[in-house]
Amino acid sequence: MREGTPRVRIEVNKGSNRPSQFVSESEEQRLQRVQSRDSDTATMNFVTDDRMMEEHDEYSAFKEAYEEEESREYVIENGVKRLVNQHYDSRGYSSAGRGQKGRREEERRRNMAVDYSSQDFRQSLAAIDQASRDGAISRGEDGVRVRQIGDTTIMTEHRDPYSFYWQLDQARREAESPPRRPPPTDYVIDEEEEVLETVYSPEADDVMFENQYRRPVRHPLPPPPPIMEEEPKDLPPGWEKHEDPQGYSYYWHVDSGTIQRQPPPPVNRETQADAPPPQIIQLPPQQPVIEEHAFKQTTTKRRIEQDEMSEREIEDVAMIENGDTYHKPVRFAVRSLGWTDISEDELTAEKSSRAVNRAIVDLTTRSDIDSIPKWGDGRELIMELDDNELALLDPDSMNVIHSERIQAIRVWGVGRDNGRDFAYVSRDRGTRRFMCHVFRCDTSAKTIANTLRDICKRLMLHRRPSSLHAIESGEKRIVRSEGLTAPIDEPRKVIRCHFLGVTQVPKATGIEILNEAVDRLVSQVRSERWILADVSIAPSTIAIVEVNGQQIAECRVRYLSFLGIGRDVKHCAFIMQTSSESFMCYVFHVEPNAAAMAKMVEAACKLRYQKVLDAHSSSRHHSGMSIHGQHPPSTYHGKGWTETFRDAFGSVTSRMVPSRSAQRL
């Protein structure tokens, strides 16, 4: 074997222990193939040749020393055995030589990567087996290389990292090992850069091909043309186009007061061509038309005569003349709340409204309402109204539980607190006392009240002479209707304005109180929150109705305590007394000034007062006038309250100039 050539020590374990053999590197591959086929486990320890030579030299020295010790003779003097030349111990070297050799042995062991002494053999073998089981591969730090080939574990030791085996292993690892993946990296994008896209035109000279890797560009579609509503060029007669403060257009019908966003349907041209040209009637100066930019306000007057019949009355008269007086009954779902008695003195024109409302409140707020007798024991009933009677029906069996003749009903009304409370007063057949019957309706009680009013109108028209022969005969027949009076529609004046709101005031009268309430609402309510409303003024009520909406409030003229104009001539307000200690102020903004509205409310108050005077004077002088055949005198120079109301409304426009003295009326 050549000097410098490494030798291999192979330990094979298969059922029995075999001694280690020293083989050359040329036989390593053959042994590996044999051990992989025949042995269960194999341990191969590679050591360098220089240490093997050193161990052989030490062994030869030990052997020579031992032989030399045995060949020498000893001299015994006085019982003491003494060497002749130099004393050696059993190992054949002196103490000084033993110290040098011991230090050399320790140095050798310190330089060795693996201790091959008997005391560390099992520990080294366990470490090698553990490394082979875990499949650990040395990285070169400890100078040990472990490989697993089949059932054989091979460990190579090298002291120099630049030795032949280390270089060979590195070259083989680079050729056989798969490429390592780069370590994971967290990419943090602080700000995304916008890539400016270059769109090449077909006419460009520098670009002759299309880049297939360029990002596709999606060209946005042009927006669709806006849908324009075709506005009619010529509006139908009576329609006008205006714009609100936000710039939106709306259409207003002057006669009916209808306001809508959609343009009105055009009138048929053929019909319009056949129709005669309209006559242009110039309005008198007492009825001016006030036009504004934000909205148009027109003061119109409805000519209502007491003897003038409406279209429904004309239809009813035609049906009566033809002999057709039958109307289908109308039914409502109601629930009886009971009844209470009312004295006959409270059924006058001045007290009946308060008496009926008090009866409704008493029956709806009583704590012992379960003990009060009710029709149908408080169950849901059907109220049927026809031209003859008012009947209460059982919804299950349709049997009549109670009925009243229409002529026997004295008064009817709707509750103030709840719009679904309906009541009527009639005389009881057994006790001959007046009873107020109260019902809770599923719908608005005004529908029942209006239906009952229409029935009474038809009954009055049926009793009225329907031909000119009866009128020309000169026979004046007085028809007594058993307490049933003809219902009359009150004349109303409608004015359009902005409603600011209602606020509570401490007193019922006073211009300072009114101005303070007006200033408070003007400062608290922004102009865009004002409600465009129609104020309907009649001698008995002032109704505030939102344009094309629901009713906001309804005030009784009899409870109006103060009326005035604010510091700004466009602000009008009045104070209503809701209870003995509660007063509410209603504030309005009128264009161009509030004088017209103030005069209308003033005229309604005067007519209300005149109506009360007429009622008292007629009751006081009724007996004397009936004897002498005279008519009752009137406070307003022989004019009725309808004519007085018409004259007052006609004179409103002549006093349109605002005045500061009109703040307190």
Curated annotation (Swiss-Prot):
Annotated spans, Disordered: 1-43, 90-111
Domain WW: 233-266
MF terms in GO: amyloid-beta binding; molecular adaptor activity
Domain PID: 330-456, 499-615
Any GO CC annotation of this UniProt entry: cytoplasm
One Pfam family cited in the UniProt record for this chain: PID
Keyword field: Cytoplasm, Cytoskeleton, Repeat, Transcription, Transcription regulation
Tissue specificity note: Expressed in the pharynx (including pharyngeal muscle and nerve cells), ventral nerve cord and tail neurons.
Subcellular location(s) per record: Cytoplasm; Cytoplasm, Cytoskeleton
Post-translational modification, as annotated: Phosphorylated.
Transmembrane segments: none
SMART domains: PTB, WW
Biased composition regions of type Polar residues, renumbered to the chain: 14-24
Basic and acidic residues bias spans: 1-12, 27-40, 102-111
GO aspect biological process, one term: embryo development ending in birth or egg hatching
InterPro entries: APBB1/2/3, PH-like_dom_sf, PTB/PI_dom, WW_dom, WW_dom_sf
Record's keyword annotation contains Lipid metabolism: no
SUPFAM superfamilies: PH domain-like, WW domain
Consequence of gene loss (knockout): Embryonic lethality or larval arrest. Heterozygous animals are viable and display increased pharyngeal pumping rates associated with reduced acetylcholinesterase activity.
Role, per record: Modulates pharyngeal pumping activity, at least in part by regulating expression of the acetylcholinesterase genes ace-1 and ace-2.
Annotated PANTHER family: AMYLOID BETA A4 PRECURSOR PROTEIN-BINDING FAMILY B (PTHR14058), PROTEIN FE65 HOMOLOG (PTHR14058:SF8)
The protein's assembly and partners: Interacts (via PID 2 domain) with apl-1 (via cytoplasmic domain).
This protein's name: Protein Fe65 homolog
Gene: feh-1
